């Protein structure tokens, strides 16, 4: 995207405040035209002083004009500031809403810190450009457009000096733009790396301290800053050179105007006041050209980060689901995978040709070694990803034909990572049901064995849990996540290692609660706990993304296959599979432990 197109697209965001924007633009144009009269009035003041005629009246008019111009500029600047800040926050809100609604794969490809950094830096740059446009850029272009014919009308020979000055500014700016384009893109790249390293280190500060990595992480940050400075220094050098060349050109131009003006005064072709007026025009043009140079500097330095932001924005629009998709009607919970395949981009991992059927109200245990595709399967059900081949149906309806919001209303998920916000306990649980009453909240926490420990906290349900629940133990975080799912009361329940962080006693209580809420609702469980697997209506064994075995717990034991070997590898002593001569469905265990 060219610099001009980037600039136009930035300004297009002001359409959301069109009336206020047009009013400020109109006022700015008027001010730009009126400003040109100031040097003319000042020239008249000089002539009246020289002629000793009506000096006070002319001087008073000039002073009133100048004061009015200042007041008008302050009012326009105040309106521009308010409009720019409103638009910045609006863009931030809308972009944030689109970003957090994007599929998980979108975030995995970009990284959280990259999306955050791009959003914040771009909105700051856009706000700066809006302010500069409404304060200076528009008035500068208008003033130059009006100034050129006015100066030529006064004295075309002196005007040529100003035109040469303008051409020099343009050539210098063009040269610097060409020299710094690639360098500015590199600067933005190193800015992202710097921000990513800081975010990564702080978010893992416990690991940094535990492994005494403070010196190493600081050294790595120092390397990032050196890379940034190495890329930024040549860019800054070019703009410093441009500033010096512009200043030299403007000084030479003023000297030329004064010398030529003095020559014409001696010849009697110009008055002293007219020369002063022309010097005022020269200074006005130099000021406007400096503003254009500053604008080009701002636009060039912002282009890389704005381009990244626009690419990110465009990707959110491209990935959004079609509008007006129907909602999922009353959900019973019958689920079927129809030859579902999903392969991660640039990877051989995924799930392949998965087919199975779950009746409404059944409990399904998904087991298999690490990386088998268990969580991917659940993510496909939640439409975190969409299958590349095949489809998934709920109650006979293809979930790709319904909107994601209604689908996710039918699902309550407890992740292995509890996923708590830096808010109060009440706020975190209430995510399950907006507007839930205290009675509903307390019932959910009691069922999840969380109510008692919450009451022991300093502010009970109004206790802040810290970033990602850092003020709570692992078991406490998990119980809050379970309470949140219980409160949602969705017809389909998904438990991703939901009891992995609980002690034995609490696990028994929570398991009883899960058994209770699993009644009459379809439940998917990713777990290695033997008790959960044994009670499942259907066990799915995955390996390398493929469904290797499926059936009830006892059916898979009798097969003496992968599932049976997984149990034995987990340290469980299991009787040999049942034979025709012996029908024994009891599996004695040496110890009751998780796989």
UniProtKB/Swiss-Prot annotation:
The chain crosses the membrane at residues 21-41, 56-76, 129-149, 158-178, 252-272. It catalyses: [(1->2)-beta-D-glucosyl](n)(in) + ATP + H2O = [(1->2)-beta-D-glucosyl](n)(out) + ADP + phosphate + H(+). ATP binds at residues 368-375. It comes from the Bacteria. InterPro entries: AAA+_ATPase, ABC1_TM_dom, ABC1_TM_sf, ABC_transporter-like_ATP-bd, ABC_transporter-like_CS, NdvA, P-loop_NTPase, Type_1_exporter. Pfam families: ABC_membrane, ABC_tran. Residues 335-569 form the ABC transporter domain. It is a multi-pass membrane protein. Its EC number is 7.5.2.3. Residues 21-301 form the ABC transmembrane type-1 domain. GO terms for molecular function: ABC-type beta-glucan transporter activity; ABC-type oligopeptide transporter activity; ATP binding; ATP hydrolysis activity. It is found in: Cell inner membrane. GO terms for cellular component: plasma membrane. Keywords: ATP-binding, Cell inner membrane, Cell membrane, Membrane, Nucleotide-binding, Sugar transport, Translocase, Transmembrane, Transmembrane helix, Transport. Involved in beta-(1-->2)glucan export. Transmembrane domains (TMD) form a pore in the inner membrane and the ATP-binding domain (NBD) is responsible for energy generation. Homodimer. In NdvA the ATP-binding domain (NBD) and the transmembrane domain (TMD) are fused. Belongs to the ABC transporter superfamily. Beta-(1-->2)glucan exporter (TC 3.A.1.108.1) family. This is Beta-(1-->2)glucan export ATP-binding/permease protein NdvA. It comes from Bartonella bacilliformis (strain ATCC 35685 / KC583 / Herrer 020/F12,63). The lineage of its organism: Bacteria, Pseudomonadati, Pseudomonadota, Alphaproteobacteria, Hyphomicrobiales. The gene is ndvA.
